[in-house]
């Protein structure tokens, strides 16, 4: 009989275990007991050792007699996988103590020794073959040994349908994975009626339909937003988006400034007023505006010289306002086809004219302060204009002057 001795730690106690292995066969060989089976024996006896140590600690504190359990007369019997265990506790005649060191200062030796005898079970060849066949069948069918009652009862029809559906899903995912890893030509995919092609094509159709519906919904939302913000009719927006290529080319050839000029000439009253035949008063006003434009030109030259002298090439506020007014005047060509936009354009032009008139007044004042000669010329032009207006109709001063001249001539005679 081969014996092995080792210790098992349980709390603050070290339990000494005497393991005896009974030989098997005619040769009395104990090689059948491997190290793996030793670990199995320790796992099976771990709970028994823990309960015995706890019982001893309780008895020692309460000073009660120990129970006669797991003795030589009534040993513990357990069965493992292919072996039989017989174990009991035996009191030691000599008290042993652990060597005091830094690691196990509180470790004590358990006063009872645990004796374990292991023997191999005498199974026949037929019994081992039957057990192996049953275990392989259960492993193939996925049946667990812990739930034998579930394995014996047949599944319900609903459970069968669910299992079949899960198997089909697994099979399709595997087939898709193989198709992705091994791409094939389009002719083979069309010619074969495999499940992977049948499942992939409807998904692509659904995806394209979803994308088409999303694009249509987005276009409708854009049309509604344009209608609510700009108050444009929906039909005109749709016509703009559905124009023919020839129309778009003809629209692209014309510059936005030309569209603006043609639209404003046909609708703006200012250009109609300028196209009429000028009268005497209109000619005087035209001369006055030309004089103002000349003054503006001289003011711009002065500003340019001042910028060059100061080294600042940035725009003065007047130039910035003019560029802002020109930016307001220029509009895209597509927006000129709507009367509402043209009305807004006319309002913007009127506002720009007012700003230009204010700038001209400021420039004329600046010219008076800087160029007194030009100011005298403008004053003389205003005096001639006033005399011309006085000559248009007889006034009381002229009559008094004529009567005064007649009186003087009569006195001389």
From Swiss-Prot:
Biased composition annotated in UniProt, kind: Polar residues: 238-254, 364-389
Presence of the UniProt keyword Cytoplasm in the record: no
Pfam families listed in its UniProt record: UPF0492
Crosslink site: Glycyl lysine isopeptide (Lys-Gly) (interchain with G-Cter in SUMO2): 61, 79, 167, 176, 236, 288, 344, 353, 396
Disordered: annotated span: 172-193, 228-300, 363-413
Modified-residue entries (Phosphothreonine), positions: 389
Keywords tagged on the record: Isopeptide bond, Phosphoprotein, Ubl conjugation
InterPro entries referenced in this protein's UniProt entry, alphabetically: SLX4IP (IPR031479)
Signal peptide: none
PANTHER family recorded: PROTEIN SLX4IP (PTHR28557:SF1)
Subunit note: Interacts with SLX4/BTBD12; subunit of different structure-specific endonucleases.
Family: Belongs to the SLX4IP family.
Protein name: Protein SLX4IP
